[in-house]
Every structure is written in structure tokens, then in C-alpha cells.
Amino acid sequence: MANRQTEEKITALYERLSRDDDLTGDSNSILNQKRYLESYAAQRGYTNIVHYTDDGWSGGNFDRPAWKRLVADIEAGKVAHLLCKDLSRIGRNYLQTGFYTEVMFRQNGVHFVAVANNIDSEEQNSGEFAPFLNIMN
């Protein structure tokens, strides 16, 4: 019998900063997003961290390189958890963002957390305001 090495699923940390976001100052910087998400993941014991970073990309454009790589990894069953700072990091088009958060992530068994919005797909009531927040993005 051949030995099969099981691959541990990853905890994906997604960071995005558009040129317009950069004007808001340091709080949304890529480095700050990474630190924020790494701290959250460590506090919860999430391991096998992989960063997906789109620096300089608009949230209205879902044809972002790191985003496309992340979606491919989700579809390939490689992702257990997906963390982002807030829903606006996923995207600014509420219909597309809603498709990912409400349909695609669930269908692929991905635990999704938008930390600053207190949205956690494993918490029963945490996503009640997600559609409203999504529209506001």
C-alpha cells in the first residue's frame, strides 16, 4: 500500500489595497492588514497561513491576480479558512461579493471571516447584517 501524504488545508489571509484606499492613510495599508489578520489567526490557532495580496487593485475589479489564485485554491479544496479585514477587501461590487460570501465559499466548505465587520460564517447570527454592509461598500 502506498503512503499518502495528506495535505493540510490552508488558512488564506486576503489583503487588498487600491490606490484610492491608500489615500485614507496607514490604517488600511497592506502591512497593517497582514499583521491584523495574522494576529487574529494566531489567537484562534489557525495554522498553515498563506497570504493572497492584491496591492493597487480596485475592489470593483474581480480580475485581480491574487484573488483569482485564491478562488482557484478554494475550488481545488485547498482552503479551510478565509480571513479578510472587512468585506470591502473582498470587493466593492455587492452582487459579486455576495456571490462569493453567500454561495461560493459555503459550497466549498470555506470558513469565512471578515474580522472588522464581525462576520463569521460559523457563527449563526454574525452574518445578519452582511448583505447591508456589502451594499454600503
Please state what every model-predicted region is:
Residues 1-137:
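Short, structured surface patches at the beginning of a domain
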